[in-house]
């Protein structure tokens, strides 16, 4: 897969628990090092519970707080990156399509061009309904990278689909 080097990046991550909580710090570091504009949106309607502390990337001080907000604030503060979070579950296709809609960024220079964001939808969810929603959003999109991750106690998988126009 070849990514365009001249487009801003937008990552929308659904799920901030077992998988998303551990993926987030690496994505923050990666986006921080890019030589182009980048946005990171973390979505999850769940709160940190005591049972999450042994297998998710949270600490006792996070108990009762929204998972998306905790991750967004923790890592954006450390790296000085502005991050968006949605403290709700994404349950409808219109909600998801609005989240993955690319913004235009001014590229500057003599001609003052605009470039659309390259959007990456990252599924870190633990339910089939949201996976189906992501798949439908991918099917209706014209320009999207969709990465879905899932795991059980002893197994896991990652699936990547791409519709990138260079």
Predicted segments with their positions:
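Short, surface-exposed basic-aromatic patches at helix termini and helix-loop junctions that form
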Residues: 32-33, 98-107, 111-115, 132-144
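Conserved small/polar residues in nucleotide/adenosyl-binding loops
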Residues: 164-166
């Amino acid at each position: 897969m070849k990514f365009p080097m001249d487009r801003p990046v937008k990552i929308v991550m659904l799920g901030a628990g077992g998988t998303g909580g551990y993926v987030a710090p690496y994505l923050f570091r990666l986006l921080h090092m890019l030589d182009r504009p980048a946005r990171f949106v973390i979505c999850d309607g769940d709160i940190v519970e005591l049972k999450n502390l042994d297998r998710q990337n949270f600490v006792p001080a996070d108990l009762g707080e929204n998972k998306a907000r905790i991750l967004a604030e923790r890592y954006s503060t450390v790296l000085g990156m502005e991050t968006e979070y949605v403290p709700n579950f994404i349950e409808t296709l219109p909600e998801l399509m609005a989240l993955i809609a690319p913004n235009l960024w001014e590229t500057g220079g003599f001609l003052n061009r605009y470039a659309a964001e390259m959007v990456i939808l990252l599924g870190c969810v633990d339910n089939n309904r949201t996976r189906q929603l992501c798949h439908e959003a991918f099917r209706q999109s014209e320009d999207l990278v969709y990465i879905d991750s899932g795991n059980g106690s002893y197994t896991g998988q990652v699936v990547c689909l791409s519709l990138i126009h260079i």
